[in-house]
Amino acid sequence: MEKIPVEKNKEYIVEIIDNGFEGEGIAKIDNFTIFINGAIKGEKVKILIVKVLSSHAFGKIVEILEKSDKRQEVDCTTYKRCGGCNMRHIKYEDTLKMKQNAVQSLVNKTLKNKIQVKPTLGMENPLHYRNKAQYPVGINKSGEPVIGVFANRTHEVIPMEKCLIQNPISEEIAKTALEFIKKNKISVYNEKTVKGLFRHIVIKVGIKTNEVMCILVINGSKIPKEDELVKILTQKYPNIKTIVKNINTKNTNVILGKENVNIYGNGYIEDNLGEYTFKISPLSFYQVNPVQAERLYNIGVEAAKITKNDTVFDLYCGIGTISLFMAKYAKKVYGVEIVEQAIKDAKENAKINNVDNAEFIAGDTEIVLDDLINNQNIIPDVVMVDPPRKGLDNKSIDNILKIKPDRFVYISCNPATLVRDLAKFEEVYEVKEIQPVDMFPFTGHVECVCVLNLK
């Protein structure tokens, strides 16, 4: 076995030859790969090796010897520790180009048709774009309760200062709740002992409606002086439409438990996306960046070229957002989603918007798709998929290939699984377009809309 050319805790000078999918710098020493957070292609840096594995190592920057013109001053005090915006040190326009290049690189490696990936659609204002904030409640070294964000790759809570991607109202509400916790000496959840009451404070905001939901995640069923907390929050923030107590007594990393108790309002808020109104409950999925989500959906719907004669399948439909966008143009839309609460919300959303040609089915996409096609003999003209990060399962791919819909639109939150799946469709479909959309500015995350037409 060849000797590894680097040692832990030793310093080296390297040139950054590329950036990875999460924005990390990549360097080589004697053909041995080193990943360096915060480094940019073209830079020369002095690094300290912090971890060595058999195939690669990790380094951290000690000094930047030659700086890239893509680098900018970081405007966030917790940037290095938080890890929420791992590309904040790079100028925004350059992050968009890097995301396009990352998707193009995957296309070139995986697909026979080396289609040219379109430039990433960025935001006009890439600040304060998130409509959902999840603040863990923890204890600092002095024993005081704090709220904030988890330090990168740990469960240490970094006290919240000013986050440039969250909605400012979310921070204000969470800080007010924290003051109440401190003043009333209410216990805070400890992962090691599995004791203590407050776990998380989650805020959801309707960007267009300004309605706010506050979710108090607790390891128990009662909050001391609960009525007083509700009064403080609702008087100070009149936009709060509902406050929900979420019961999570499990020893788990999952933030929300399954039981919700409304302690103010009716347990949901509404927001507008395009011309539609959507009902958002504590457990329902709703795009975190609705400004970009609207652009994403419009691209997908436009690409599908839906007509009044078309039957459409919307797989992994969530709360029915894109289903409703498509229903306007289609004869019938079938939305499929495994999360039952999301399907309840989807049905409610169809009712709110007077859409009567969309049917929503709760169940495993693989099984429901199989049933629609092979038992009910419903053959779609258009299939729209928006799967989780793991991509499409083989059974769903086989069923789509079996029915060969004329038009097929794949919305993806993971370019690696997108191109893996596209390779399986290439014999039958032509990949017409791949459009990256920047849903999470200054992070390594990129969504793509991919349009496929039957050959």
Where on the chain are the PLM-derived regions?
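Short, conserved phosphate/pyrophosphate- and ester-handling motifs at nucleotide-, phospho-/glycolipid
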Residues: 42, 166, 289
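Short, acidic/hydrophobic/Gly-rich beta-strand patch recurrent on exposed beta strands
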Residues: 25-30, 148-151, 215-217, 346
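Rossmann-like S-adenosyl-L-methionine
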Residues: 2-13, 21, 225-455
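Short, aliphatic-rich beta-strand segments
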Residues: 203, 209-219, 277-281, 382
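Short, solvent-exposed loop/turn elements at beta->coil junctions and helix N-caps
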Residues: 118-126, 191-192, 200, 204, ...
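Terminal RNA-binding accessory module
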Residues: 1-78, 359, 367
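Extended interfacial segments that mediate partner engagement and assembly in macromolecular machines
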Residues: 62-74, 83-188, 208, 223
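Short beta-strand micro-motifs enriched in acidic
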Residues: 50-52, 136-140, 204-208, 453-455
